[in-house]
Amino acid sequence: ISAYYYTKNGIFLGDNHLKNVQQFPEKKYLENFDYDLAIPGDTSRFWVLAQEKINEDRKIKFFKTHNALVKLGNNDFTSRSNSLGGIYIVRDPRNVVDSMSRHFQINHDKALEVMQDKKNFTYDFKKKKDYSDYQFISSWELNYQSWKNNNLLPIKFLKYEDLLSETFFVFKEIIEFINKLTNNKSGFSRE
């Protein structure tokens, strides 16, 4: 997707194009806000304001997140004026358990416990008492439902397994979805 929209020829040239897809929330977008980095979730007070600042140039941007589409306290994750839509990649929970156990070097039972934790969140674990990159994930099920049942944004749901087995067709669906959201009438180009 990054190469398709950010290069003239659509050729992916490695990590440079991946840098066009940033993560949100992330510390660099929250630097000018007064929050307590030692308190998990305190950055949520500024999620929408940070997005407004990101969008000041009125250009289309792509972001990735693990965040549930929920309010944290009284704080929305995003707003309609800040987000055109989303693409949610659903992965078979059995594969998520296996992937998590390898990534975090924990056993399958612990990985399943984390996936079912309604209060689950992530942040940069290498930083001590610095929750500036805090993302509220919740459980696998509630995270999925928060995006599936939302009335705020159009969301395109894709199966991770389909991305692997039917890459071209899924990619085409993604491009058509993005073009619709952005009123891009140029259509899908194979070239």
How should each PLM-predicted stretch be described?
Residues 1-158:
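PAPS-dependent sulfotransferase catalytic domain
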Residues 151-177:
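Phosphate-binding beta-loop-alpha motif at adenosine-nucleotide cofactor sites
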Residues 183-184:
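Inter-helical turn/loop segments and adjacent helix faces that build the functional surface
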Residues 190-191:
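PAPS-dependent sulfotransferase catalytic core
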